[in-house]
């Protein structure tokens, strides 16, 4: 609890001027979870917890003039494997590590579509327009992407350039972080700064409402 409290205090002090909505819990000596920061007032909020998983999605409701919309902030199941560790295991012919890796990948491949369907059902029942963003841990050829882009545009496709890779450890191969928005709007810009804050690069998008 103390770790979560410290994380919440840090967020509130670091991002003054923003409304911060978050769901955090202690993990590995720190805190893990989702955070949504907004300069707009938050008129409603909620979370979608995934069964037997540390991952989740949160959402916030906002008003801009006479328009009301919801923003989903998603973090879907990852493979939870170390690429360096896998490479070393292959080099050593370590069957135990390879078997563990296979188990983790199978678990992720099974869980992620279930999580996606859970969020999609919530989106379908949402009474207002919805924007969807976050770490999908899946590529643009996946079921995850196909499902989440239904009825929405991909900001990178509309306004980005290059490969659009967001995962730094396999740059420029993987684009697994997305900003999706209703089809009637337009993405003005899309940028992925290569900054060393995380193993993921930030995705910065400007959308004309």
Question: What is each of the regions a protein language model found here?
Answer:
Residues 38-43, 53-95, 185, 209:
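Beta-strand-turn-beta hairpins that frame and shape the catalytic cleft
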Residues 2-6, 28-31, 54, 79, ...:
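Active-site environment of divalent metal-dependent phosphoester hydrolases
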Residues 1-64:
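Membrane-embedded segments
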Residues 18-19, 67-69, 126-129:
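Loop/turn elements at helix/coil->beta-strand transitions in domains of secreted/extracellular proteins
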Residues 113, 120-130, 136-209:
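Metal-dependent phosphoester-hydrolase catalytic domains
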Residues 2-5, 106-114, 170:
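Soluble non-cytosolic domains of exported or imported proteins
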Residues 6, 10, 32, 111-114, ...:
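Extracytoplasmic/secreted proteins, especially bacterial periplasmic and envelope-associated proteins
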Residues 96-107:
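Short glycine/proline- and acidic residue-enriched helix-loop micro-motifs
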């Amino acid at each position: 609890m103390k770790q979560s409290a410290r994380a919440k205090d840090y967020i509130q002090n670091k991002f003054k001027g923003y409304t911060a909505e978050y769901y955090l819990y202690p993990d590995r000596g720190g805190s893990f979870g989702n955070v949504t920061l907004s300069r707009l007032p938050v008129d409603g909020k909620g979370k979608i917890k995934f069964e037997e998983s540390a991952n989740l999605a949160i959402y916030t409701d906002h008003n801009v003039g006479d328009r009301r919309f919801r923003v989903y902030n998603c973090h879907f199941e990852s493979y939870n494997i170390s690429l360096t560790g896998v490479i070393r295991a292959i080099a050593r012919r370590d069957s135990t590590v390879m078997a563990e890796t296979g188990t983790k990948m199978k678990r992720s491949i099974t869980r992620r579509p279930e999580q996606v369907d859970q969020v999609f059902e919530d989106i379908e029942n949402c009474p207002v327009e919805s924007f969807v963003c976050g770490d999908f841990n899946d590529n643009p050829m996946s079921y995850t992407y196909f499902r989440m882009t239904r009825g929405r545009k991909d900001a990178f496709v509309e306004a980005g350039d290059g490969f659009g890779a967001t995962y730094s450890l396999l740059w420029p191969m993987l684009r697994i972080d997305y900003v999706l928005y209703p089809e009637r709007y337009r993405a003005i810009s899309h940028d992925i700064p290569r900054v060393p804050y995380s193993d993921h690069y930030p995705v910065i998008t400007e959308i004309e409402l």
